[in-house]
């Protein structure tokens, strides 16, 4: 990440921001070569859906076969922590300020949206990846795909 995000955010807020960022980021294949968000969000969604049942299966399998409970609990906790790691990464990414080149691209897309008559909230500080996700989502739904030519 380019610069350090604000460290005053609690873990729970970071996970909530990660979930919001995952829902906001446009899952467009044109963005995949440049941004890792598509891959991380897809893996996190998969983990949220698959890992809790896998943890329960691991626990019941170990208990049913008379195995040791310690390793079974450790494996289940590890399986449940994987989606949390993805949400944590997405949350940290969402509050990270954009590097200068991406900030310039962000302002160009925002300017194109404003020129097309879209109402946007004013920027109160340096743009973050969350504000980029908001603008990209709006641009994909309102503009033609030529705004991606500068990427």
UniProtKB/Swiss-Prot annotation:
Q: Which GO terms describe its cellular component?
A: plasma membrane
> Any keyword Magnesium?
no
Please give, as recorded in its UniProt entry, the membrane topology of this protein.
Answer: Multi-pass membrane protein
Q: Which UniProt keywords apply?
A: Cell inner membrane, Cell membrane, Membrane, Transmembrane, Transmembrane helix
Bilayer-spanning residue ranges:
46-66, 69-89
Which InterPro entries does the record cross-reference, listed alphabetically?
Answer: UPF0208
- Intracellular or extracellular location(s): Cell inner membrane
Report which superkingdom the organism of origin falls in.
Answer: Bacteria
Main location per UniProt?
membrane
Return the similarity comment.
Answer: Belongs to the UPF0208 family.
What's the name of the protein?
Answer: UPF0208 membrane protein PC1_2779
